[in-house]
Amino acid sequence: MTHQPRTTSILSFWTNKLLLIAFLSFSFGLSNCIAQQNNWLHFTPEKAQAKGKKVVLISGDEEYRSEESLPMLAKILTQKHGFETFVLFAINPETKQIDPEYQKNIPGLENLQNADLMIIASRFRELPDEQMKHVDNFLKAGKPVIGLRTATHAFNFPKESKSAYKHYGFSNQEGDWKGGFGGFILGETWINHHGDHGTEGSLGLMNGLQINAKNPILLGVEDIWVPSDVYGIKNSLKNSEILVFGQPTLGMTAESPINRKKSIMPVAWTKDYQIPGGKKGKVFTTTMGSSIDLLDKNLRRLIVNASYWAVGLENEIKADSNVDPVGEFKPIMFGFGTHVKGKYPKDYL
């Protein structure tokens, strides 16, 4: 009998601990499920860590699996760096499932109204005006933008389109918006594959001039290797700061030698933008950024550092900050038609 109170006490202790864990898990899940009902994810940092900055990450590409990479980046930004994040997806309105091949619907863009940063990795989207207006208003306000990989050709409107935002299309050649969103805002539109797509990777080489100038975005970043190939660039980027050059590699592994027959191309840069009637804003663009590319720690650090820089927190960038994925991250190889079918936003919590 003398041992029963101790046993009861231990059982009570662990029961209370389990109830607390269950409650916290339920509370965290509930906040995200509420967001998921509207087809996007919403992550909030702990109060002690919060930066007071909101970031909207926009996926929606058919090939490079941004529906995998952006939730991972959002969790790093929230749990490791104190940013509040929203992750948006291409959603099929009939199934309510994530469908990168459905090009006309990305719910949740209204979250840009009070966001501090937009990170976009979309490809060839033809969004309705009621969604595009939120992107346009964000840019008119001169707020910062980070473009990843296919964001250079994020939008595509056919010639017969009646959209008020047709000029965002990657092939536009009219007025100020030559090259559309990519050409006018990010610095380049879609040109070509400079490297051999699917057989050559990219070695990202730091620009020594920018390192010498102590560019905060490059703090702690070393050479990057990714399996996606180098994109071609035609724009001189004369008003940009080139941070990283990409050299094609003869193979799809980090040990592959460089292809000395091919020139280097800019693969990461910063610049300013200003749309007609809008305020001036700043941009970080990298043509790297498939989901499998983000297995490279240095690329993750580059993007996290760029996020700090974009929202004016460059003085808080640390060379050894934690940029490890939160939980398991097992991206699949890029390719058309390879996305995992039947997924909902909540599946990427």
What are these regions (language model features)?
Residues L88, F245, T286:
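Hydrophobic residues at beta-strand termini and immediately following loops
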Residues Q36-A50, E68-S69, Q79-K80, L250-L349:
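Extracellular ligand-binding/catalytic regions of CAZymes and related secreted enzymes
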Residues M1-T15:
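N-terminal secretory signal peptides that target proteins for export/translocation
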Residues L41-T44, V56-I58, E62-F155:
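Helical hinge/lid and interdomain linker segments adjacent to catalytic or ligand-binding clefts
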Residues K51-G52, L148-E255, A319-L349:
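An acidic, glycine-rich "communication" segment
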Residues K17-S31:
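Bacterial N-terminal signal peptides
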Residues A50-K51, Q113-N114, A141, A213, ...:
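Residue-level preference for short coil/turn positions at secondary-structure junctions
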